[in-house]
Amino acid sequence: MSVPRVVHGASGETAQTPGMERKAAIDARSVGAQRVFMGRVTAPPHSNSGAHHHGESETAAFVVRGTVRVYFGEGFGEFVEARAGDFLFVPAHVPHVEVNPSPDEPMEVILARGPDNIVVNLPDAVDHLTERAMATSSGG
C-alpha cells in the first residue's frame, strides 16, 4: 500500500552540474517517486553553472533566496531573471546556464522536474559564455 511520506531536508545525492549544488529531496530513492523529482539547488555569490539541459524533463522552480539568471538561446545570448519569490519554468531539451549575479548573496532554488532529474552536461558549450555572463552580472 502506498502512503504519504515526509523527507526532512534535501540531502540526497543526485546528478550535478559544475558551479552549483543539487540535493535531492523527492525521488525514486527517497520515496519511490516514479514521475517527479524535487530538490534544492544552491550557488555561491557571483557564480555560474556549466551549460546543460534536462532531456525530456520540464523544470519548474521557486526562488527562495537571491537571484537566478538563466541564459539560453543562440550562443546563450538571451536570459530571464528570477528573484526571491518568483517562479521559473525551463522547457525540456533547452540548453541553459544558471548564473547567480549577486556579488554577495547566495542563491537558493526549490525545483520540481518530471519525470526524473535528467541532467545532460554540455562542457564544450560554455567557455565563451562564462566571461560574458560574469561581465553582465557585474554591470560590465
Regions found by a protein language model. Give the residues of each.
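A short hydrophobic beta-strand segment most commonly corresponding to one strand
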Residues: 38-41, 60, 89, 104-122
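Conserved metal-binding segment of the jelly-roll/cupin
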Residues: 43-44, 82-102, 113-114
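A generic "binding-loop/recognition-motif" signal
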Residues: 56, 75, 94-95, 115
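A short beta-strand-loop-beta hairpin characteristic of the jelly-roll/cupin
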Residues: 48, 57-84
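A short, N-terminal "cap"/entry segment at the start of jelly-roll beta-barrel domains
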Residues: 1-35, 50-51, 124-140
